[in-house]
Structures are given as structure tokens and as C-alpha cells.
């Protein structure tokens, strides 16, 4: 072997060895994924700030991933839709490469439901200039959480070099969101703040256009120059040997490289400048280059670098020169190492000499050490208080104080004092205006013919867990399984005090939609207060919940016939069921009324075979199951009927084993209540499984599913005189007759008549909560709220709960009063659904906010309220009955006994 050949082999081996060694100098973002300190509290509370918070219990310090402090997360004070200006800021104190973020909603041990389905990120390296993070395709929005408890990790491609990071939660409608976060990455030891370079160019090849631009650069672009930012040359991604290929998926040819043609640079070099965070001693610069010389890409012919210590200083001395020569041998991409000789500086200017048609770089990194000279150290970035970062920095003076530099604005103390006084005066004027407004409201109420007691006006968008006022007093309450974050100013673990109903009426955000003019109370003389009614509870603001009294006499002694209103209101308790909100509001029972424990009708769990999940909620799920060998269970213990050859379908409500103690107690109470219901048009409790977890209750389920889906799949027969013969087939599919629709409505009225005799209030009567069995048998159920299919029928109130406002009487929406009369209103809407064959949602032309405003029109009673239109198949007489169901005055609505009698006997005569 000749000497020349041996020398060539040694040179090639040296180049490969140097290239491999130099590759180790480029950081690997895959190894830069350490938690940066939110969860383990390495990041102190003082370095976490927010634009606003709902209360102290949802302040910035509670935003740590997997933390359950306070109310369980950071929750902004206002809605994030549509402006998306609320943010959570984390100060990392030093530059870090952030490669991954984790988010979580507010779970709070099962009490919270708020989370953010998507969010944006902004970041800053100096506290002054903020950049929007974008992925490699220019998208800013990051998908977030689908539930409040799960942690969702998102890779950031490209990663961002930042000291301060802001999370901006997003929503597609007005709703509450809460957030917990963690950042993952590592310390940015390069210290590179920005680089300045010519804009990358496009290479025209015969088969493809190769775009060699810096697509992730986060600085400015002007005059063919990119400056003030970082991009692909500092993202840790090293290009492949063939620059037309890429490490990333779904990107264009040349994505990994930034390149320039020598034809565009008559000087024969590309000049770049690099700015660092502080004064450094530079040992080596490593540049990863492409050398696919068959397509024109060559290594640089040489590199010249100069240094300076400050932005206003001149470049120091002679440049450091390093000749490379541009290899025509090995076409593989490689990292070249440029020795910098230990020069000191904070700014570098490097010129890369062309040795061929193109220069292509994918990564540039530096090996350097920080100079421990405080006089030359670049000061750390200022910390900005919550709010938009200032845009004019000419008047800012940086004063380090301890470990936290602050931005101090030069200003006159007199101006600050005047501003404070103006703010105080405006606040006092606002308080006076609110007091006058409240006083005027009280006068209006006192002048009305029918007095509405303040304690009766618990006027807010009522949720299923709210107090329901019966006989002007709240029913006994259980601690709700879902709790919204405590109001601002309320100390932890204290119950919010409700001063009076008028204040709630005036302060309710939803009610602001309604007060275009002053409302007046309902007209007509009010009924005298029954002598047996207890006085209004004056301790409603105590920290404890009321317990039901233990009467020795019957719960509700019958009053004189002429002393009660048309609809009596009973003492009730509300239960939070498996799915987070049971629909029934039921009478408060004296001890021993239904036994001390759940009925001992233990259903054999092994006989249940899962078919599908009907719905789910906060504390459990509702499953559709089939009972195996049901004929063996036919006995007095299990009220089931089995038809030979037909499977027995049941609905199984399952309580999660980790449910709270309150949820378990409510579950057992619901079992007791359900065991009292025995009516052919109400679903029955067939049995329970309470010996071990998970607790289950088994109820009827009908083979034809819910009434909404059943009717929407059918057409109305043309012959209105068709008898009760059921379904028939036509060319358009199954049909249903008008008499059968009346039969359906009569069965619903019959079931509700039975509930009314027990003083049960359903609160969510709709076709989605009615089940259809054999021969058009209708049974009223209560788990429609848990089904995702009907999520659009419910309105979320400030992230707290969901309400079927399109079916609710105006007094339910505005005053939280649920009575049998409000169920009559919902029955009228349900009957409208039946006659429309469930083709349309009630008030489908109105938004949710307009429906609430329409409830306000009923309250004001100025003739501007909107009613549901008459269905095409509905006779005028029947429509007039429906309008009576929607009477403004609850006592003017027909009772269910009258509704059932009309639909069962008289309705056909009106056709």
C-alpha cells in the first residue's frame, strides 16, 4: 500500500472520528426532558404569576401539576372566551430549553370539573419581548385535556428557549377553565440568546424545489436578514446526509437545513452574528454541514470569527481564522469543529467562506464557559407583574433586589396618589349606585300586589344541587359532590354566606341579561301562609347544612282546603346521583319512613352481562346490561316480567369505588327513594348490589330505547283517525299515528300524576328521559343528563352544572324554584316534542342566552315573551292546553290529573 493511499485513509479516519466526537457537542433534545420544578416545588410560588384568579384558593400557587392544594388548580377570574387573555406565567429564572409541557384540569378529589381542551403558549427570554410558540407547520393551538384529572403531555416541536413561559387556556364558548401545569426540559447551557443570518434560500433541482429557509425562526425578518431570535440552527435537530430528506414527518424537502447560494453573495462568504446571555470564554464552535457535493452542497472553505464584549463596542483585534478547504471526498453530512482559542466576548461575528455553489447548515453550537466577572455579566431579565408586558422600556430602570429583579417605572408620586384617589372615588360611586339600585328594586317588590319574600328570591341560574325553596324555606342540604371554586374573599373551608335573595338576583351574572328594564313580581293575590308552615330559616348563612327536622306527627299535615295554593310545595331534599346530579327532588322523609337501610333485595351481580355504556358522570356510570337466565329470578323479590325468547334489558347505575362518602350516602338514599316508586309509567328499582364495591342499582330498561330517538326515526301517518295499532311501515320507513302520540302523552302525564301525589319533582322531564317498551309502553326515567348524545340540550352555568333550560319554567331558571307546577311546564314542552316527532329542539332558533332572556320576559310580563309554536299535527284545543302549561303564574297551570284525563279521554274528540 502506497504512502499516499495510507495518508488518505488516515485523513478519512480522522475526519470521521472528529465528526463523531463533534456530534457529541450538539445537545440532544430527546435527552432534555427533565421536570423543571412545578410539581416538586423547585420553582417557588413567587416565580408563578397569573393575569387573574377566581379566588385565593385558585391562585397561581395552586397551578402545580398533580397538586391538590387550595381548590385544586389555578382558575382565572373571568371567561377565557373569546379574548383568550387570561394566562399563567412561570419564571424559570435562567434560560432553559423547554421540550415538553404537561397540563391537567381541576379535579380536587372529584369535586372539580373544569379543564382546558386547548391552550396557547407564549415565551420570553428577557421579559420584554414575547413570542408565540408555533409548531413546525405554523399552528399555535395545542390540544389539551379531555377530563379534569388526567395529565396530558405534549412534545414541543420545535422546542423553545425561554426563561418565562405563559399558558393561555382557550375555550370555544363562555365557560370556566382551570389549569395545572409542568414544564420539562433542561438548562440552556449554550447561553445563546439570538443569531442574525441572511434569510435561507430555495434550491431549484430538476425533480423538486428544495426550500432551505429557517422556518422556525422566532425573531424578526427585514431586508433579507433575520435577527433577534433563534430557529432551526439551535433546535438540536441534525440534518441527514441527503438534504432532500428530513428527520421530521410531513415536511418539505430541505426542511432540516438552512442554505445559501454563492451566487447571491459576491463577497464569497455568509456572515452571521451570535448574541449570548453573558460574557463567556469560547473554546469551540461546532457547525453541522451538508456535503452532498453532487448536488452542489459543500463544506465551508474556511471560517473567520471576531468577538466583542458589548453591543456598543467595536470588534476586537484580528479575527480567528480556520481553514477547512471544502471536502470533495466523503459526501456524508458532518459536524466541523472550529477552535476559537479561548477568546472572551458576548457577541460573535463569523464569516463562512464558500467552497462550492451552496452552504447548508443544520445546527450551530458552542463550547464555552461563563466569565465570573459581575461587571461584564449580562443582567438577568426583569420580572413583570401580571398584566400585559410593557412596550415602552425607555423609562424603565432595572434594580436588582435580593434574588428577584423588578422593573421600576419612573413616575411622580403625586401622579400615583391622584390615580389612587380617582380609583377610590370611582369605587365608592359604584357602591352607591349599586345600593340605590338595590333600594329601588326592594321598593318595586314591596309595592307589588303579590309580595315575593326576599328569602324566596334565591334568584340565580339554579343548578340541581342548589337550594330549592319550599314554603319559603330551604330544604335540608347535603354537601354537593361538585363544588365550584370558592368566591373571591371567602376563606378556605368556609361556606359562602347568601345574604338575601334580592342581592343574589341583582348580582347574578346571567340575570344581567334580563334587567333591560325593572321587573315586577307576579301578579295576582298570593295565597295566605298556611298555619302549619314553619317560618323562614334565618340561619341560612351558617357554616353547617340544615338537617331535616324529626317530626313526631306526619310530615305534612293536611291544611284546610282553602288555605293552600293550587300547587302545594313540599319539604324536599335533593340528591347528587351517580352521574353527578340526580334529577328527582324528593320529599324529606322522617326517620324510619322507608327503613334504616337500603332494601335487602340483592341482585346477583354475576347475572349481569354488559352490552354498552349509556352515560357517565362524576361519580359513576350507567350501563345497559342483559340479565342472564332471567326466568330463574322471577319471584316476589324481583318485580320483573320475562317473555320467552326475549332478553331482559336493565339499566345499571354503578358508583365508582373511589366516590366520596357524600356520594355513597346519596347513592343509598336514592336507592331508598327509588324503592318507593311503584307505577307502570315509572321505571322500577329491580334490585341492588351493595354487599361490596362497586355499589350498583338495577332498574328497568325498555327494548325500544328512549322516546326521543324512537320518535325521530318515524313519520306521522296521514290518517289522523288511525287507532292505537302501533307502528306501520311505509316507503319512508316506520310511521306512527296521531292517536298513538296522544297515548304516549297520556302515559307520561299518568306517570307524572303519580309522582305529584308523592310530592316528587322530576326537574328534567323530556322525551330523552322517557323509555319506550313493548306496545308503546312509556316509562319515565332520569339518566338522560348523563348521555353525551344529549349534551346539547343542557346549558352549563359558569362551569358548575348543566341545566335543561329549554324545558325549564321561568321561575326555575331565575329563582331556583322547582315544584310540581314547574314539572307541568316541562310536560308541555315534552308534549310539544312528541307532537313534533322530536324533529326540533325546543326554541331551536334561540341561543341559550336568548332562552334565559326569554325567561326574563316571562318575569317582566310585558307581552314580549316567546312561546313554542303550534306543531303541524296539533289541534288548536290541544295547543291551548299546552299554552296553559306555560302560564306565567304557577297556580294557573293545569294539574297532571287534568292533563291525563284530557289526553286519555277528550283529546281525540278535538281532531
Swiss-Prot record:
Disruption phenotype: Mice are born at the expected Mendelian rate, but female mice are dwarfs and most of them are unable to bear offspring, due to defects in blastocyte implantation in the uterus. About one fifth can bear offspring, but for these the mammary gland fails to undergo proper differentiation during pregnancy, with hyperproliferation and abnormal branching of the mammary ducts, leading to a lactation defect. In addition, mice exhibit hearing loss, due to alterations of the inner ear. Mice display poor calcification of the fibula.
PTM note: Autophosphorylated in response to fibrillar collagen binding.
Gene3D superfamilies with a match to the protein in the record: 2.60.120.1190, Galactose-binding domain-like, Phosphorylase Kinase, domain 1, Transferase(Phosphotransferase) domain 1
EC number: 2.7.10.1
F5/8 type C domain span: 32-186
Superkingdom: Eukaryota
UniProt motif (PPxY motif) ranges: 479-482
Record: residues binding Ca(2+) 2: 232, 235, 237, 362-363
GO molecular function term, any single one: ATP binding
One GO-annotated biological process of the protein: lactation
Transmembrane segments: 416-436
Active-site residues, record numbering mapped to chain: 764
Glycosylation sites: 213, 262, 372, 392
Function noted in UniProt: Tyrosine kinase that functions as a cell surface receptor for fibrillar collagen and regulates cell attachment to the extracellular matrix, remodeling of the extracellular matrix, cell migration, differentiation, survival and cell proliferation. Collagen binding triggers a signaling pathway that involves SRC and leads to the activation of MAP kinases. Regulates remodeling of the extracellular matrix by up-regulation of the matrix metalloproteinases MMP2, MMP7 and MMP9, and thereby facilitates cell migration and wound healing, but also tumor cell invasion.
Membership in a protein family: Belongs to the protein kinase superfamily. Tyr protein kinase family. Insulin receptor subfamily.
Protein name (record): Epithelial discoidin domain-containing receptor 1
Species for this entry: Mus musculus
Gene: Ddr1
